[in-house]
Amino acid sequence: MRVRYQVAGMTSILLVIAIGLLWSTRTVNAAADGKITGTVKLDGSAPHMKGIDMSKDPFCVKQHENSPAHLENVIAGPGGGLQNVVLYISEGLSGAEAGQVPSQEPVFDQKNCMYTPHVLAMDVNQKFKVATSDQTTHNIHPLPNALAGNIPWNKSQPPGAPPIETSWKTEEVAIPVKCNIHPWMHGYFVVVKGPYAITDEKGSYTIENVPPGSYTVTAWQEEYGTQTAKVTVAAGKPGTADFTFKAK
C-alpha cells in the first residue's frame, strides 16, 4: 500500500510539473506574439539609378539582354514606398530577448551577376548562406569593421560551388559586400540583435515576435542613413512606426 501511495504521489508531482511547463511555454509564446508594423517612404523624387555596364563578362551581359540592370541604392515605388530598408529594435529588449537566434538560414544569392537580395538582414550568430546561381565565377568579399569584432573575408565561388555557410559575431549596421571580379556588384549585410524586418516593394514591413513593451525602432537605408521612432506594443495590439526619408 505504501508503494502505491508513493507512486501516486510521484505521478501527481510529475503532472504538476508538466502543467507548469506547459503554462510557462504558453506564457512565453503569448508574450512574443506581438508585432510592429509600418511603412517607410521617400519624400521627393527618387534619384535616377544609373545603368550598369557588364561588358566585362559576356555571361552577365546575356542575362540582361531584355532587362537592363541598374544600381539598387534607392528603390522607391509609385507611392514613394522605399524598398530594402532594414527595421530593427535598437532599445527596449531584454538580454534574453535580444540573445535569441533564429533557426532559419537566410540566403544571399549571386544571380544574374547581382546580389539577391540587395540587402540581407540577420541576427548576431545567425547562420546564413551565400549561394551562386550563375554560370560564371564570383568572388564575394564582405568588408566589416574589424575593430567592431567581425573579420573580413573573401572567397571564390565558381559555377556549381556549394553555398558558403557562415555567421557574424557582433552587431554591425551595415557591412558592405562586393565582388572582386565584377566591380558593379555590391550589397549589404545588416547584423542586429533581436527581431528585424526589411521593407517590401511598397515600403511596408512587419517585425514579428515582439513581446509587449516600449521600444525604439531604427530604420536604416544605405543612402539616407538612420531614423528612430518610439513605439509601444501591447498584448494583442500591434505597435506602429512609420518613417519618411527626405530625398537628396
Q: Residue ranges of each PLM-predicted region?
A:
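Intrinsically disordered, low-complexity regions enriched in Ser/Pro/Gly/Gln/His and often acidic
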Residues: 14-16, 177
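C-terminal segment of classical bacterial N-terminal signal peptides
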Residues: 17-27
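Arginine residue identity/basic-tract feature
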Residues: 2-4, 26, 129
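Extracytoplasmic copper-binding redox domains, predominantly the cupredoxin/blue-copper superfamily
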Residues: 28-248
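Bacterial N-terminal signal peptides that target proteins for export
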Residues: 2-14
